[in-house]
Structure formats: C-alpha cells, structure tokens
C-alpha cells in the first residue's frame, strides 16, 4: 500500500450466522475532492479473499481531512472476538497512532448480543450511562496505544464513543516556554490598551508592519492603531483537569479546524444511545503544523486577563485560520540596546489577531523621554504565518478594549479605598509627570567621575554614594551657598521622583516614596551642617548673620519647633580681644609644657645611677660653666615667647658642641629655676585676668542692655598665624632637646666606661 493512503483494518475471528456485521472487511482511506471543491478522505471497504484486496462496497460517508498529514499514515485496528455464547462477546480496540497532535472520532454499530470493553491511556473521571470505566495505557516507540473498555449492554443499541488524543506540547524555541510548559496570566497581571506609537521602532516594524506607516514611510496620526499590552505572564506545567461530556456525533462530513488545543484537553470518552443502523465512521483531525506555538488559556483569578486570551483562542468562528505567538528572541549577540527601559517581566503584545510574546530583558513600553532617544536593536523577530480576517479582528479588538475599560474602572474603585497619604503621594507623582519638565537625574554620564560618584535606584530602596547633584551641586568642599540650599533640595526631590516614575513606568510604590523622602531629608541635614561649618570660616559677618537666621528657621521646620527660642550672646570688649589677652593662655601652655619636660628629665635621672666620683665631677663642672648655661637658657626663653623669630635654628647652632655635655649636666638646675619663673608668671597673669574680668563686668552689662540680641555675632575668632608658628617652633625645639639629651647620655656612658 502506498504511503499516500491511510488504512483502517478490521480483523475478526468468527462471524455469527444469520447476522450481518463489520467483520471480514478492511477499509482503505483514499483522499478525494468533494462537490464543493474541498479535499476529503473517503473510506472504501475492501473484502479480503485469498490474499487479494477486492473492493465490495463504497461507503457514502466521507470525512473532511483538509488538514490531514498524508505523509504519516495512521493505522487503526479493530479486533472482534465473537463466541457461541450470547452474553460473553467482547470487542478490543487497540489504537496505535503517531505522536503528533491528532483527534479521532469513531462511531461503531455493535451486535445485539455484543459487549464492548474500552480502556483509556489517560486516567480521568468518565461517567457513561452504563457503568464505570477501567483505564490503562502504554507507550511504544513514541506511539500511544489506547484501549477502551465498555461494560455489556442489555438493549439493542449502538455504542458511540469519541476520544481525543492528548495534545503534545509544540516545540517552541523560547527561554520561558520549555518543553511541558504553557503560558499563564497571573492574578496581578495588568492589561493595558496603548498606542502603537509608544512601542519601540523595532517592535513597530515587526509587529505592526505597514499598519502604522504610509506610503512615504511616515506615521500618520489618524491611522495609529492601539495594541493590548499584558504583563507579567508566567509559564506553567501541562495539567490535565477537564471532565468529559456526552455528545452524539452524526455520520456527516466534518470540517477540520486548526484550533489551538486547550490546556485541559485529555483523553475523553463519551457514551450514549443512537440508532442501530448507523455505519462505521472514522473522522481524523490533524494539525498541519504541530510545531506552531499556541496560547493556552489557564484558569486564573484575574477574569479580565483570562477573557483576553479566551477571546483569541476560544472563538469557533475563526474559519481555517489560527493565531500565532511569534517570539521576540533575545539570544542574539552583539545587539545594540535600546534607550527604552528593559522590562522586568514577560509580557504579551496583542494586535491584528497576533499575540507576540515579549520575553525578559527585551524592549518594553518606553517612557516619554526615552521615546525621543530610542535606538533600534538587532533583535530578530519571527513573523506569523497567518492572519485573521479584518471583521474578526475588529470584533476581537472591541471585546479586548471593553475588558480593559472594565479593568480600569475597577482600578479606580480601588484607589478610593486608599489612605490619604497614599493618594497624596500618587497625586504628587502624577503632577510631576504632567509637567513634562526634563530634570537632570542622579546618574553620572561623565566617565571620569564614574568611579567617584554612583547612584543606585532600586524597587524598594535608594542608595546614595557621593551623589552628583544637578546644577553642579556637590557635597564636601564644593558645597553651594546657603541661599541656594532650599532650591537645590527641591530639585533633588523632584529628580528622584522623576527617576522613579521613569524606572517603574508610572507604577506608584509607597515604599519607594517613603525611602526617597527619608534619604532626601538625611542628605539635606548633612549638606546644611557642612555648609554651616564652611561659612563660619569663610563668610563675612553680614553673611554669617543672615545664614544663622535662615538656619534657625530651617531647623525649626525640621524638628517641629513652634515656640520662639532666643539665645542671647555677648561680645568680648576690644581690649580683651587684643594680642595681650592671649599672654595668660600662652603662659599656661608654656608652664604645662615645661612641667611635662621636667617630669621626663627627672624620670630619666632617677633611672640612672651614678657613682660618687661622677657626682663630684658634675658639681665642679656645674660651678665653672654656670654663666654660659644661663645665657643659653635665656635664648631658649626668647624663642618660646616669640620675641626672636630668627632664633628658630636648631639648638646645636645655639650651643657649641664643646659645651653639650656641660649643658646636659646642669639641665636639672636650669629647669627647676625656669619652673619657678613660669609659676610666678602664671600667678601674676591669673591676678591680671581676674582684674580685667571684674573691671569689664559693668561694661558687658551696659552692652547687653543697650544692644539687641539680633545684632550679636559669634565671638569665636580663628587662631592667628603667628601663634600657630610659635607653637610649631616650640614643638620642634622640644623634639630637638630630647634628641640631644639622648646623645649626651650616650657620651656620658662612653666617658664613664673609659674612666
């Protein structure tokens, strides 16, 4: 038998006398053309006699197999076993079929005393009117064997049964649709009706084609269509849950419609009553292209999203057309990224009877700013092979738009139940969007400053790491003037809101707004503190006065202070702020430094043990060189008091090298004498300070009574340069003295060892 023919073989063991049945016949399926010009499959019963096939009867019943795949023959074998008993007859119907998607309908006329037994390959809840059903199944070399078992019937009837082979999942090259998975729209999915012009140019070119472009290639405003945008979508496993229904097929010609399979399709068994004279019919429905992807409507809590897909796949008046879901493949390397923001979830774009699956990372709906700078990428798109007629597309579009409107109304009802704070935040974000003012964002575009400043904006938190603010606003040493602080903070908050709207595609999140407000307030406080510290050292008195008043008002707003707080500050008189007033402070510093040096010298002397001979020699040398050491001590004091600036040279130049040991020997005497001097000076300075303070008490009171507290300024003045230089000289001289003392100690040890 040639490959272009499909055969239905009926094998029997014995035939009961006096009764006409279907045994001993082999049916040959021959493709023909009907009167209406359609392709049909005709069943020709053939009698088997001495090994030759002889056609005996031509059955008038035909099946429409327009979509049948004649390259893969299907063999259906009936094995009928009839015994002498009138109640023990049974029929087994093993069916072998290829693994592609096939739907078969069988109607059989059973003998008056016959019994049927049917077994299904799929386990399900079957409820025929006769009794329960047993089921089992096996798989052989990618072929499915199905056996149906029906309990015996006591009446003269004919059993009618239809079974649908399990729909195998088409092969789809997609990262979100692996083998065994289908698309699912979750409950929180959003269904939007957007203009086609809002899509990226690449998607417009591949999905819309020439629908939005005129002959010159420009987009006409009056012909811009709308598309349905559904996101997010997920993938689910293939689940079999649908129950069976009882139907009565008629022996007529059936049209083979290429309708996408339902996710709940399974092996079904239907039983019922039908006249006995019904002949045997075999109707095959096959898919011409089993590898075409299909949309699967899955039961979901979101009725609107489910109805959208049911609109595309649940209509029976689509004719011979089907709906494809071409994929936006994202596996191409070396593509240029579009300026439009990549979507975080999978999405569906529906237009003109086609459903496009937009995978993760591909270009989604761009924002208004991104549309102006969108760049076409090299993402390959697969065009669909078939389109739905214009009238059907119009009906589908109307139904989808109605469902979207219902969704938007329900969203408005939900917003009424929100709290006042949430509504306020949403209103602020909408106002920022309606202004259409492009504000600079925090993101750094300069490659030289990329490592210095970074801005991270995520779903639920905002991280600032040395941010670069708009209009050259920078933290640290380049802090702006205090007068522009409030305006800059407002720009920061608005730019943060604008960036959030762009990144989240106008999805309002309360957590983000709260986090951004907290971060903005923290940055504001830090900038104010840094600006205040810098202006105290650089600003003039008038600027300091204005900044202090402004800072007070801002801090009152920040901390919620409502009462007037007055801080009274008094000025120090001019005679106290002169250079003489610092003598007491300098004397205190000198005395403390000398005491520290004295303690160090005494500790070193206690640790060392000298012999009696050594002590006697030191006393003699101290008497002979007493005058020279006093002169050296006077020079050191002049350096400490700042009277002789040119005497900042090292101590080795002041003291000759020959006198180093002698100077070291009488160091204790000179330090004790200097200690007495500093203590006397300290007492005199304290007395003088008390006198000046008591004399200036009346002056300060009169100043406080005569002048207003608003005119007072901070009395803190920066240290003078001369004092800083003097302190540095003192520190260096102390270090040099310690080094020289250490060198003298080594000389003493050497001299002691030699003696």
From Swiss-Prot:
Residues 665-698 are annotated as: Disordered. One of its GO terms (biological process) is regulation of DNA-templated transcription. The modification Phosphothreonine is found at residue 717. There is a cross-link at residues 270, 436, 590, 687 (Glycyl lysine isopeptide (Lys-Gly) (interchain with G-Cter in SUMO2)). A motif (Nuclear localization signal) lies at residues 612-615, 625-628. The keyword Nucleotide-binding does not apply. It is found in: Chromosome; Nucleus matrix. InterPro entries: LRIF1. The modification Phosphoserine is found at residues 391, 419, 425, 584. A motif (PxVxL motif) lies at residues 565-569. Residues 678-711 form a coiled coil. Keywords: Chromosome, Coiled coil, Isopeptide bond, Nucleus, Phosphoprotein, Transcription, Transcription regulation, Ubl conjugation. Residues 671-690 have a biased composition (Basic and acidic residues). GO terms for cellular component: Barr body; centriolar satellite; chromosome, telomeric region; nuclear matrix; nucleoplasm. Its main location: nucleus. GO terms for molecular function: nuclear retinoic acid receptor binding. Belongs to the LRIF1 family. Together with SMCHD1, involved in chromosome X inactivation in females by promoting the compaction of heterochromatin. Also able to repress the ligand-induced transcriptional activity of retinoic acid receptor alpha (RARA), possibly through direct recruitment of histone deacetylases. Interacts with RARA. Interacts with SMCHD1; leading to recruitment to inactivated chromosome X in females. Interacts (via PxVxL motif) with HP1 (CBX1/HP1-beta, CBX3/HP1-gamma and CBX5/HP1-alpha). The Pro-Xaa-Val-Xaa-Leu (PxVxL) motif mediates interaction with HP1 (CBX1/HP1-beta, CBX3/HP1-gamma and CBX5/HP1-alpha). This is Ligand-dependent nuclear receptor-interacting factor 1. The gene is Lrif1.
């Amino acid at each position: 038998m040639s490959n272009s023919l499909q055969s239905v073989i009926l094998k029997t063991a014995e035939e009961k006398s006096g009764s006409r049945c279907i045994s001993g016949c082999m049916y040959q399926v021959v493709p023909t053309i009907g009167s209406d010009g359609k392709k049909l499959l005709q069943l020709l019963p053939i009698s088997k006699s001495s090994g030759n096939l002889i056609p005996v009867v031509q059955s008038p019943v035909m099946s429409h197999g327009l979509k049948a795949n004649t390259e893969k023959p299907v063999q259906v074998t009936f094995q009928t076993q009839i015994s002498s008993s009138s109640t023990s007859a049974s029929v087994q119907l093993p069916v072998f079929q290829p693994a592609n998607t096939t739907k078969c309908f069988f109607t059989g006329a059973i003998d008056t005393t016959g019994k049927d037994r049917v077994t299904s390959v799929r386990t399900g809840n079957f409820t025929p009117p006769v009794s329960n059903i047993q089921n089992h199944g096996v798989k052989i070399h990618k072929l499915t064997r199905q056996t149906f078992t029906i309990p015996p019937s006591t009446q003269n009837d004919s059993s009618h049964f239809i079974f649908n082979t399990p729909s195998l999942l088409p092969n789809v090259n997609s990262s979100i649709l692996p083998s065994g998975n289908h698309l699912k729209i979750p409950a929180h999915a959003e269904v939007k009706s957007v203009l086609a012009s809002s899509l990226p140019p690449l998607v417009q070119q591949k999905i819309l084609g020439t629908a939005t472009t005129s002959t010159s290639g420009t987009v006409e405003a009056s012909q811009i269509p709308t598309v349905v945008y559904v996101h997010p979508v997920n993938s689910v496993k293939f689940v079999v849950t649908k129950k069976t229904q009882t139907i009565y097929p008629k022996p007529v010609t059936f049209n083979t419609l290429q309708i996408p399979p339902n996710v709940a399709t399974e092996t079904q068994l239907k039983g019922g009553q039908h006249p006995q004279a019904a002949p045997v019919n075999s109707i095959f429905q096959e898919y011409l292209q089993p590898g075409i992807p299909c949309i699967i409507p899955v039961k979901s809590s979101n009725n609107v999203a489910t109805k959208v897909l049911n609109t595309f796949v649940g209509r029976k008046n689509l004719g011979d057309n089907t709906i494809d879901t071409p994929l936006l493949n994202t596996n191409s390397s070396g593509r240029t990224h579009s300026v439009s923001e990549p979507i975080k979830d999978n999405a569906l774009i529906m237009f003109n009877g086609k459903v496009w699956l937009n995978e993760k990372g591909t270009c989604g709906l761009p924002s208004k700013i991104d549309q102006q700078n969108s760049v076409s990428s090299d993402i390959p798109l697969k065009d669909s092979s078939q389109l739905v007629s214009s009238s059907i597309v119009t009906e589908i579009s109307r139904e989808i738009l109605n469902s979207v409107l219902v969704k938007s109304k329900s969203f408005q009802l939900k917003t009424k139940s929100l709290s006042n704070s949430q509504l306020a935040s949403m209103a602020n974000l909408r106002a920022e969007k309606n202004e259409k003012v492009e504000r600079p964002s925090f993101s750094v575009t300069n490659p030289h400053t990329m490592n210095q400043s970074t801005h991270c904006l995520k779903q639920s938190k905002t991280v600032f790491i040395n941010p670069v603010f708009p209009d050259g606003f920078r933290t640290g040493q380049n802090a702006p003037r205090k007068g522009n602080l409030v305006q800059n903070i407002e720009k920061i908050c608005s730019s943060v809101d604008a960036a959030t709207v762009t990144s989240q595609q106008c999805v309002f999140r309360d957590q983000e707004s709260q986090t951004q407000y907290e971060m903005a307030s923290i940055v504001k406080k830090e900038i104010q503190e840094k600006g205040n510290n810098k202006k105290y050292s650089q600003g003039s008195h008038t600027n300091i006065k204005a900044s202090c008043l402004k800072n007070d008002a801002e801090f009152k707003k920040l901390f919620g202070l409502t009462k007037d707080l007055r801080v009274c500050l008094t000025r120090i008189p001019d005679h106290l702020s002169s250079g003489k007033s610092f003598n007491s402070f300098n004397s205190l510093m000198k005395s403390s430094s000398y005491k520290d040096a004295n303690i160090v010298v005494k500790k070193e002397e206690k640790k060392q043990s000298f012999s009696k001979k050594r002590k006697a020699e030191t006393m003699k040398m101290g008497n002979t060189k007493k005058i020279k050491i006093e002169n050296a001590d006077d020079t050191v004091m002049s350096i400490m008091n700042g009277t002789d600036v040119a005497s900042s040279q090292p101590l080795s130049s002041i003291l000759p090298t020959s006198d180093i040991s002698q100077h070291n020997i009488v160091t204790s005497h000179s330090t004790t004498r200097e200690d007495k001097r500093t203590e006397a000076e300290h007492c005199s300075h304290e007395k003088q300070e008390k006198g000046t303070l008591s004399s200036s008490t009346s002056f300060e009171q009169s100043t406080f009574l005569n002048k207003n507290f608003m005119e007072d300024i901070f009395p803190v003045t920066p240290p003078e340069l001369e004092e800083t230089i003097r302190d540095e000289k003192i520190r260096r001289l102390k270090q040099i003295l310690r080094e020289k003392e250490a060198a003298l100690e080594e000389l003493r040890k050497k001299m002691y060892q030699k003696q």
